[in-house]
Design a protein with these regions (language model features):
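Acidic-and-aromatic substrate-binding clefts and catalytic sites of carbohydrate-active enzymes
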Residues: 114-118, 139-147, 169-174, 202-208, ...
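Alpha-helical scaffold elements lining the catalytic groove of polysaccharide deacetylases
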Residues: 119, 169-194, 207-256
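C-terminal motif of bacterial Sec signal peptides marking the signal peptidase cleavage site
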Residues: 17-20
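Structural recognition of the beta-strand scaffold that forms the well-ordered cores
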Residues: 107-110, 135-139, 160-163, 199-203, ...
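N-terminal, intrinsically disordered, polar/charged segments of Gram-positive cell-envelope systems
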Residues: 6-7, 25-100
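Positively charged n-region of N-terminal signal peptides that target proteins for export
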Residues: 1-4
Length: 297
């Protein structure tokens, strides 16, 4: 914002007049739900008060030259630009657009059904940071409503938020108006909390129909299911202490280039994620940034 300070003296000098001198300052600060904010030094504002000085010999008027307009600074919400180098094929695998220039030995990490609780979410985020990995967190609207602070944390930690419907219902069994509501409400609440609108969509249970796909497309959402299921959600018959290793075993058995790996915000997944990512790296895999995926596929 350009602010100009002009101290104006009297145009006509009169003997015995009072000399006026204004002093004042104003500092503004702003806050946002964006991932981070940048403080900006305040510029003195127009004089707010006028004090009466002793009678002195009148002084000539003084005009402070107009300050130059400062160069605009980058917005605190500005994100790193990521080149579009991958696309999703019909099997929901992530493949390079240019196979000669872009590695094909990558996996896409995704986590469904959050945000649930800090105790599970924080270890997931910490592990992703440790491996410099990005993931899509497909969230449910009713959970975002209960824990907006957790959604904000996902965003502030640099991860990507996807739409997973409001109530986690089988959308393939619903009519268009219900589908519209389920997707639209999630778009709205994520935008309200983070200032960003999701661009990825995964239907719960992979349940879909033509209306689901069309409505998702109308909202600018890239529809996907997965190509590698960790089965971390299907552990009722697995002893608790064996579940972390079972997640790794399931992923490794289905591993392929471009794996679109489905996981959830579950305790055993959080416990084993570091080990899983380490093993993937040892096999030569890297983690694709979701922002590098072409949304027009």
């Amino acid at each position: 914002m350009k602010r100009t300070i002009i101290v104006a003296g009297s145009a006509v000098l009169l003997l015995g007049s009072l000399a006026a001198c204004g002093k004042g300052s104003n500092s503004n600060s702003s806050s946002s739900i964006a991932p981070s904010t940048t403080a900006t030094a305040s510029v003195p504002a127009d004089p707010a008060q006028t004090a009466t000085a002793p009678v002195t010999t009148p002084e000539p008027s003084v005009v402070v030259p107009e300050q130059p307009t400062p160069s605009p600074s980058s917005s605190p919400q500005e994100e790193e630009t990521v080149a579009i180098t991958y696309r999703m094929n019909k099997a929901y695998r992530i493949v390079p657009i240019d196979k000669e220039k872009t590695p094909s030995k990558v996996v896409l990490l995704t986590f469904d059904d959050g945000p649930k609780d800090e105790a599970t979410l924080k270890p997931l985020l910490d592990t992703l940071d440790k491996h410099k990995a990005k993931a899509i967190f497909f969230v449910n609207g009713y959970r975002v409503k209960a824990h907006p602070e957790l959604l904000k944390e996902i965003d502030e930690r640099g991860q990507v938020i996807g739409n997973h419907s409001w109530d986690h219902i089988e959308l393939g069994k619903e009519k268009a108006d219900k589908i519209e509501e389920q997707l639209g409400k999630v778009q709205d609440i994520v935008k309200e909390v983070t200032g960003k609108t999701p661009v990825f969509f995964r239907p719960p249970f992979a349940s879909s129909n033509d209306a689901v796909r069309q409505i998702a497309k109308n909202k600018g959402l890239l529809f996907m299911t997965w190509s590698n299921g960790s089965l971390d959600w299907d552990m009722n018959k697995v002893a608790r202490e064996k579940r972390p290793q079972a997640v790794i075993d399931n992923v490794m058995e289905q591993l392929h280039e471009g794996s679109n790996i489905l996981m959830h915000e579950l305790a055993w997944t959080a416990e084993t994620l570091d080990n899983l990512l380490t093993q993937l790296e040892e096999k030569g895999y890297s983690f694709v940034d979701p922002r590098a995926i072409d949304l027009t596929a």
